[in-house]
UniProtKB/Swiss-Prot annotation:
Residue ranges, compositional bias (Basic and acidic residues): 1-11, 49-150, 157-166, 201-225
One GO cellular component term noted in the UniProt record for this chain: cytosol
Binding site for GTP: 339-346, 386-390, 440-443
Protein name: Translation initiation factor IF-2
Renumbered residue ranges of the record's region G1: 339-346
All residue ranges annotated as the tr-type G domain in the record: 330-500
Pfam families given in the database record: EF-G_D2, GTP_EFTU, GTP_EFTU_D2, IF-2, IF2_assoc, IF2_N
Source species of the chain: Histophilus somni (strain 2336) (Haemophilus somnus)
PROSITE patterns, per the entry: G_TR_2, IF2
């Protein structure tokens, strides 16, 4: 329904079709005329009024748009014409300015040319005047000479007049005038901006000059060329000159280098280096590692300059780049307090700390950093290291850091010398630190200080009372008796040692202890040994490095700098350093990082090398400098009698070449302290009816210490003897294994003289050295070149058999000679 309504409302069209018929005449294929009827249908559509109105509106709209577009184009054309007009005016103005500038420049050039001409004229006049003066002077000199010549005799008149008539031509004035004239002519012919043209004339006498002038003209033409093809003057010059000889680069050689690396550095083939080394008597492969000296010889042989470089050159350079010529001043002593458990070490430390730290700081010690310094009544300073036990003390010594100057040995007056007291004495002696003995607990009624002195005599600690150099000070840590006397004794000992250090300069010290704090990161306690450590310094500590972000003293207060013998807590390192590591201030953080990475890379090699350090089989490599080798031993036994017997027997084993040194001995099981001492001293540990505890076993495993258990003393002594025998230099002995008598001599084209022999004794071997005897006198010593039985090459011939022997490099064998075959045998020496 809706569709029908829509169709009714739609504009109606009236279509009229017209049919038209017509006739077209044409020519057929046979040439006759032919008529064809064609029907044309035309269709005309008549639109209604609505459609006509819509078409008119569309036409009006199109007309308006066309007019609008025409107006816009007209405006654009007008704007374009105005822009072109403005541009033309601008070009006209610029052209006028350029012409004005050109005219002014032309005027300036004219003025310059005029001024130049005037100067040239003035110069010419001056030259002319100078020439005239020179000629007048020469003429006067000639006339004067002529006048002098008139007074001479008539015989010499003609000759002298001729001589003086030429004077104006040969005198210095005339020569000067001629030189001036030549210079003037040269200057007159030159022009600043023009090339002098050759004169056109007849044929040249030589073709070479003509060719040169032609090439010059060609070059000038090329230089003066115009356009993009014109050549620059610099293009005529040769850009590269071939060197007369091959340039030899400097070769940087480390401590070791492979043949391939050396070839790359020398820019040659590896085969050339192998050939050179073959000529030098060394057979190598392309990947073989050669040492620095060999590489230097090869490089110099091939004409290169060698620069030797150590692998740790950067580390040495960083360490040596320090302040020098700084003045040394007196420094405070660094003291470690050691002793047996419950003998009063901690009480003594606490009393000194409370009594000598300033009143305002007495209760203000917020944290314990392992070290602190106090001032005495005289205003002098002492630094105390609080190292619980002896492990840290020995570890620092094992790493080569001698932090302690003086050891205070605390012994209880009522208890006497105990096992840990003896250990402390051994550690102090191993570190070469002087002892000061503090006899504690003298306030007790059962105290007996004299007994302590007597017992320490047995351990070579001799008091001043008995003529020794060890100070004994009776103290009471509980009541504070003798504390000032102890401090005075420490200061007296430090004066004897004459302790000095550089105060102003880059600091160096040792790490006392370190740990990782959750909030602050790696924290290290550093004892400054020389120089001044400032906040912001770059510190290198073993494998770690970093800039000092903060420094605190033992009271927890922030400080800006610390001098010698001052312990400080440092923040800012890249990691936690090991106790005993050396701390050094360096200038460059980048170089410090490189050194730290280099040390980390070398750590594994050092660890592997340490595994072989204390093995019995390699004790020969640990020989001390000189002829005498030392075997360090630590002895632990179940009873004192066994210890004394073993130590005495070991001392008796010592010889002129190998000495046994008992580094430590004691009663009881093997402790961590014993293991640390063995690692520090490269010692063998011997346990007689005792065993190591768990912590000691861990240290022994980490440090690869040689630990041996025994229950029979003879087995112990025999193995120590074997170790000492291995450290002795071996002996070599010659043993005669065969003798052959020469029965006849034959000549061989290849081997020369061949001795026909009968083996009379022993065995003749092909590869053994020989001697030729004549009348029981050795006339030649060498080796065999050939050994044959009949026509077969053999390796050995037994007694009673005939053989042919060719002696290498010796042809004077005669009938009746004896050929003696021997071998060199290594005889192991035993103690």
């Amino acid at each position: 329904m809706a569709d029908e309504i829509k169709k009714e409302n739609a504009p109606k069209k009236l279509s009229i079709q017209r049919r038209t018929k017509t006739t077209v005449s044409g020519t057929s294929t046979t040439g006759k005329s032919k008529e064809v009827q064609v029907e044309v249908r035309k269709k005309r559509t008549v639109t209604t009024d609505l459609e006509r109105k819509a078409q008119e509106q569309a036409k009006l709209k199109a007309k308006e748009e066309a007019e609008k577009r025409a107006a816009e184009e007209k405006l654009a054309e007008k704007a374009k014409r105005e822009a072109e007009k403005a541009k033309a005016e601008q070009i006209k103005i610029e052209k006028a300015k350029a012409e004005q500038a050109k005219a002014s420049k032309k005027n300036v050039d004219v003025e310059k040319e005029k001024r130049r001409a005037e100067e040239a004229e003035l110069r010419r006049k001056a030259d002319e005047l100078a020439r005239q003066k020179a000629e007048e002077k020469a003429q006067k000199a000639a006339e004067e000479a002529k006048r002098y010549a008139d007074f001479d005799d008539s015989d010499n008149d003609n000759g002298k007049l001729d001589d003086y008539s030429d004077y104006h031509l040969t005198s210095s004035y005339a020569l000067e005038a001629e030189n001036e004239e030549e210079r003037r002519n040269e200057n007159r012919g030159r022009s600043k901006n023009k090339v002098v043209k050759a004169k056109k004339g007849g044929r040249d006498d030589e073709n070479g000059n003509k060719n040169e002038r032609q090439s010059d003209r060609r070059n000038q033409k090329d230089v003066k060329g115009k356009g993009k093809h014109a050549k620059k003057a610099s293009a005529l010059q040769q850009a590269f000159t071939k060197p007369a000889q091959v340039a030899k680069a400097d070769v940087v050689i480390g401590e070791t280098i492979t043949v391939a690396e050396l070839a790359a550095k020398m820019a040659v083939k590896a085969t050339e280096i192998i050939k050179t080394m073959m000529k030098m008597g060394e057979m190598v492969t392309i990947n073989q590692v050669i040492d620095q000296d060999t590489a230097q010889l090869v490089a110099e042989e091939m004409g290169h300059k060698v620069i030797l470089r150590k692998e740790n050159e950067l580390e040495e350079m960083v360490m040596e780049d320090r302040d020098v010529n700084a003045e040394k001043v007196h420094r405070a002593p660094v003291v470690t307090i050691m002793g047996h458990v419950d003998h009063g070490k901690t009480s003594l430390l606490d009393y000194i700390r409370k009594a000598k730290v300033a009143a305002g700081e007495a209760g203000g010690i917020t944290q314990h950093i392992g070290a602190y310094h106090v001032e005495t009544n005289d205003g002098k300073m002492i630094t105390f290291l609080d190292t619980p036990g002896h492990a840290a003390f020995t570890s620092m010594r094992a790493r080569g850091a001698k932090a302690t100057d003086i050891v205070v040995l605390v012994v209880a007056a009522d208890d006497g010398v105990m096992p840990q007291t003896i250990e402390a004495i051994q550690h102090a002696k191993a570190a070469n630190a002087p002892l000061v003995v503090a006899v504690n607990k003298i306030d007790k009624p059962e105290a007996n200080p004299d007994r302590v002195e007597q017992e320490l005599l047995q351990h070579e600690v001799i008091s001043e009372k008995f003529g020794g150099d060890v100070q004994f000070v009776p103290v009471s840590a509980k009541k504070g008796l003798g504390i000032d006397d102890l401090l005075e004794a420490i200061l007296l000992q430090s004066e004897v040692l004459e302790l000095t250090a550089v105060k102003d300069g880059m600091a160096s010290g040792v790490v006392i202890e370190s740990y990782l704090d959750k909030g602050r990161g790696p924290v290290a306690t550093i004892l400054v040994q020389s120089g001044t450590l400032n906040r912001g310094d770059i510190v290198l500590c073993g494998f770690e490095y970093g800039r000092v972000r903060a420094m605190r003293d033992e009271n927890g207060k922030d400080i800006q700098s610390a001098g010698p013998s001052i312990p400080v807590e440092v923040l800012g390192l890249s990691g936690v350093p090991a106790a005993g590591d050396e701390a050094t201030v360096v200038r460059d953080e980048k170089k410090a990082r490189e050194v730290a990475l280099y040390r980390q890379g070398k750590f594994r090699e050092v660890k592997l090398a340490r595994q072989q350090k204390a093995k019995l089989e390699n004790m020969f490599s640990n020989m001390a400098e000189g002829d005498v080798a030392e075997l360090n031993v630590i002895v632990k036994a179940d009873v004192q009698g066994s210890v004394e017997a073993i130590v005495q027997a070991l001392h008796e084993l010592s010889t002129a070449e190998v000495k046994v040194k008992v580094v430590g001995s004691g009663v009881g099981g093997i402790t961590e302290t014993d293991a640390t001492l063995a690692a520090a001293s490269n010692a063998i540990m011997v346990g007689f009816n005792v065993r190591a505890d768990a912590t000691a076993r861990r240290v022994i495993e980490n440090e690869n210490i040689d630990l041996r258990y025994y229950s029979i003393i003879y087995e112990l002594l025999n193995e120590i003897k074997a170790a000492m025998s291995g450290m002795l230099q071996p002996e070599f002995k010659q043993e005669i294994i065969g003798l052959a008598e020469v029965r006849d001599v034959f000549r061989h084209p290849k081997f020369g003289a061949i001795a026909g022999c009968m083996v009379t004794e022993g065995l003749v071997k092909r590869n053994n050295p020989i001697r030729v005897l004549r009348d029981n006198v050795v006339i030649f010593e060498g080796e065999l070149e050939s050994l044959r039985r009949f026509k077969d090459d053999v390796s050995e011939v037994r007694s009673g058999m005939e053989c042919g022997i060719g002696v290498k490099n010796y042809n004077d064998v005669k009938v009746g000679d004896q050929i003696e075959v021997f071998e060199v045998v290594e005889v192991k020496r035993a103690i």
